[in-house]
């Protein structure tokens, strides 16, 4: 059978799992980034003209959004991602972002998920980066897949029986175009798009 398009086959797709503290970027049409989020935030950024995109995954050390020392961790994660895109040929004024996560998963972490979400939205606003979509908060973990070449994102909410990585605040710094599709693992049906356009 002859393929009539340039879409990569399943055997060509490379899935990179992005863990807490990581930042990745690519221009490959064969690359897919995947992560699981509880209280953490992941930012998916893309320059749709250059066809480059990337993802970070971070958790602030505390829920205190006024603590400049703690906010450094989130700012560092964002700056790493932006710089990685610029090195691949992105133009800063064209970069678009989608943000996910910030759930309230355990009493031990308190309102840290909410603080992470607030930080991400404020950072994008302050830096003049357009947030085209977000899915934040709640009390369920999310599985995210991101196609950096096109900016497409797929989200699935996980159930209580699913294994979610143990998220812990970190105290050391570590070095969009497209559509968003939502699935519910309990019925495997595409859900109405609950992403809200930020105000």
UniProtKB/Swiss-Prot annotation:
Matching InterPro entries: CheD-like_sf, Chemorcpt_Glu_NH3ase_CheD, Cytotoxic_necrot_fac-like_cat
One GO-annotated biological process of the protein: chemotaxis
Keywords on record: Chemotaxis, Hydrolase
Catalysis: reaction(s): L-glutaminyl-[protein] + H2O = L-glutamyl-[protein] + NH4(+)
GO terms, molecular function: protein-glutamine glutaminase activity
Top-rank EC class of the record's enzyme: hydrolase
Keyword Ion transport: no
Protein EC: 3.5.1.44
PANTHER family referenced in this protein's UniProt entry, alphabetically: CHEMORECEPTOR GLUTAMINE DEAMIDASE CHED-RELATED
Family that this chain belongs to: Belongs to the CheD family.
Protein name (record): Probable chemoreceptor glutamine deamidase CheD
Name of the gene encoding the protein in the UniProt record: cheD
């Amino acid at each position: 059978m002859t393929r009539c398009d340039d879409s990569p086959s399943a055997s060509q797709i490379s899935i990179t799992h992005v863990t807490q503290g990581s930042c990745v970027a690519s221009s490959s049409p064969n690359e897919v980034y995947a992560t699981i989020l509880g209280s953490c935030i992941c930012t998916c950024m893309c320059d749709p003209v250059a066809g480059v995109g990337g993802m970070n995954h971070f958790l602030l050390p505390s829920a205190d959004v006024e603590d400049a020392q703690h906010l450094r961790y989130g700012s560092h994660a964002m700056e790493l991602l932006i710089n990685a895109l610029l090195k691949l040929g992105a133009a800063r004024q064209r970069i678009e972002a989608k943000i996910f996560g910030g759930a309230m998963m355990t009493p031990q972490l308190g309102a840290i998920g909410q603080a992470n979400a607030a930080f991400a939205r404020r950072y994008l606003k302050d830096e003049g980066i357009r947030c085209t979509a977000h899915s934040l908060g709640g009390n369920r973990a999310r599985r995210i897949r991101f196609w950096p070449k096109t900016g497409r994102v797929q989200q699935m909410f996980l159930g209580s029986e699913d294994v979610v990585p143990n998220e812990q605040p970190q105290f050391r710094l570590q070095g969009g175009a497209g559509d968003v599709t939502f699935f519910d693992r309990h019925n495997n049906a595409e859900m109405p798009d609950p992403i809200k356009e930020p105000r």
